[in-house]
UniProtKB/Swiss-Prot annotation:
Source species: Citrobacter koseri (strain ATCC BAA-895 / CDC 4225-83 / SGSC4696)
Annotated protein name in UniProt: Lipid-A-disaccharide synthase
Molecular function, one GO term: phospholipid binding
One term under GO cellular component: membrane
Family named by the database record: Belongs to the LpxB family.
Amino acid sequence: MAEQRPLTIALVAGETSGDILGAGLIRALKARVPNARFVGVAGPRMQAEGCEAWYEMEELAVMGIVEVLGRLRRLLHIRADLTRRFTELQPDVFVGIDAPDFNITLEGNLKKQGIKTIHYVSPSVWAWRQKRVFKIGRSTNMVLAFLPFEKAFYDKFNVPCRFIGHTMADAMPLDPDKNAARDVLGISHDAHCLALLPGSRGAEVEMLSADFLKTAQLLRQTYPDLEVVVPLVNAKRREQFERIKAEVAPELSVHLLDGMGREAMVASDAALLASGTAALECMLAKCPMVVGYRMKPFTFWLAKRLVKTDYVSLPNLLAGRELVKELLQEECEPHALAEALLPLLANGKTSHAMHDTFRELHQQIRCNADEQAADAVLELAQ
């Protein structure tokens, strides 16, 4: 009698965040099906968990139109080759992790060949280019969504979707230790502390840093003991921020940090940040915040017409109301930002209410996402 083939899962991750998700999923699946086989496009973490890499993840990790155009032929070749090889292999399930521009077409190709497909991490279809939901519905058997309002969106279009919670909510404690974080950063337990996070992209740091620094200067007038911590994602962004600081606020003393964004949020009484994943992380760190964002006028004009949501920050989208002040474009200026931050630094009723809501929202999306994702894969594989 022929030996039964082990459970075979094909995966494609396109960047570091996807590699982390893929590794967590593989770990959860291996705990239940020790002899399962994992193949595809994998980063170092997925490979360390036993995923056989047909291509290195870096091959897909390109950003920006110019870079993508330069690599387009190679990307199309990889996608065609994966379609052919996965079709030959006939895995039990294919899991495309994020990287929607690459993965959703691949998922559609494989679904036509009778392979069950999962898209892990919903693109922001609920916010803009909503018609993409129809292609996603045609291409996948199941979307795994981090956030409850994402599932509600897919339900409207009858696209199978499972809310699994957010891995970041699983990783972060419900009650972070502010004093321990301050000890790590060398900040007094008694001082007022503000975190400035002007974004991870060069364009964001260029647009926001001057206003954020001027805001800190204004707040120092009310709180002379104010410690300002600025975590920057890499050396390039740090150099850029230092250049802007030398021009607009050379005398302002700040703690520049290499990475350590999470520690800065946990340690701070309030944060001023660009929108994006940082706002979700700040919510999970239980740090009251103000979101300030500015973009080129034409980009903003276009975004206002394309974006279908009332809010830009994830805490507000989760709460369904303006929990966190969002100051965009012309409103993103030092006096308005400082005015919004003052009550948060006072550490009174406003910040305590925000903290309590953050904790409730954290509990809502803390669902052991790795295990939930593994459940979905195994159910589909049957």
